[in-house]
Amino acid sequence: MDIKKLFELAKPYLEKNDFGVAHTRRVFDIAQENFAVPPELRELTFASIILHDIGGSSIKDQYEKGPEIAASILKQLGCDESFIQEVCRIIGSHHDHPDNPSLPFRVLYDADKLVMFSPEEFPYYNSRAAVNWEKIVCLIYSDGARRLAEGLLKQRRREA
């Protein structure tokens, strides 16, 4: 799959989100830098990451509109139906926290949580009264990503 082409096709939809394409790029980069994804799962993982917020800014829109938009884009790229269905299943539930998710789901979920600790996004989330940083850290699946989040949280709090 041509990841660059997927980003191009997704861009008009992602630009409508709160953090825009930059958020998706940050999640993508975090995943590439911090998670070992086996070659046979890379396309599924990275397509899911690129398309995870495609439906809009709200979780409701992401879950309801996202899979339909994602399926259309993936069909344009010639992806097979089982691949499309799996990407749509992942993006249509990526804010949930299932007990035993697939590796592509875990990588997306953890990278999407880690981006919250980035210099670009932390101030936004930290200004919201309902954010419980310790709970967010605990929800991260990977031990390594959890340790990274703990370190980033300490750093961001020192900077604030």
Predicted features by range, described:
Residues 17, 56-60, 77:
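Short, surface-exposed loop/turn motifs that are enriched in glycine and acidic residues
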Residues 1-5, 11-39, 51, 79, ...:
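Divalent metal-dependent phosphate-bond-processing catalytic cores, especially two-metal-ion Mg2+/Mn2+ enzymes
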Residues 40-41, 83:
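Membrane-helix interface segments
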Residues 80-87:
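Short, surface-exposed acidic
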